Amino acid sequence: SGLIIDVRNNGGGNVTNSERIAARFTNEKVLTGYIRHKTGKGHNDFSEPYSIELEPSNSIRWQKKTVVLTNRRSYSATNDFVNQMSCLPNVTIMGDKTGGGSGMPFTSELPNGWTVRFSASPHFNADMEQIEWGIEPDIKVNMDETDETKHIDTIIEKARAFLKGEWTPAASE
């Protein structure tokens, strides 16, 4: 048994909330990544990386197997949540690569009325790999066309089978 968290098609939200949720899945402090801040006008004017650590919640924590479902429409604070969860030993990320972005967007209007929005602070995972362009899942699973015509969610069904120990990625190859 286990838990499935489906963040597919989630455009983001509040980074603080993603941290509060992820904190329910660890009993100890975990390094989840790094962030750099802009320090000047130059293209490469950024601070040294600051570590980001996930502190365990002071409330109820879930320590059983967990699968987080992702796709290319998982953005911003959702991307941060997936990154945090990917650092936890009882969590498996399944589905497709996330859409990327960080939870710290900068938005401004140009003189012509166009709106510009971009990540103000580059985020990296615990291995110092850029996550702004998305996070690959631990297990890639695509929707099956036959299942889709029958209104069956292939990805959820694979996650259920994985949690029950009835399916492994190697067994399907």
Set out the residue ranges of the language-model regions:
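Extracytoplasmic/secreted envelope proteins and their assembly/folding machinery
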Residues: 18-22, 66, 78-82, 152-160
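Gly/Ser/Thr-rich loop/hinge elements
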Residues: 12-65, 124, 130-131
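Extended C-terminal subregions enriched in glycine
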Residues: 65-87, 92-99
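Low-complexity, Gly/Ser/Thr/Pro-rich intrinsically disordered linker/tail segments
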Residues: 135-173
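C-terminal soluble interaction/assembly domains
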Residues: 86, 93-111, 116-118, 122-124, ...
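Terminal peptide-recognition signature
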Residues: 5, 25, 66, 85, ...
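Sec-exported extracytoplasmic/periplasmic mature domains
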Residues: 1, 23-30, 86-90, 160-168
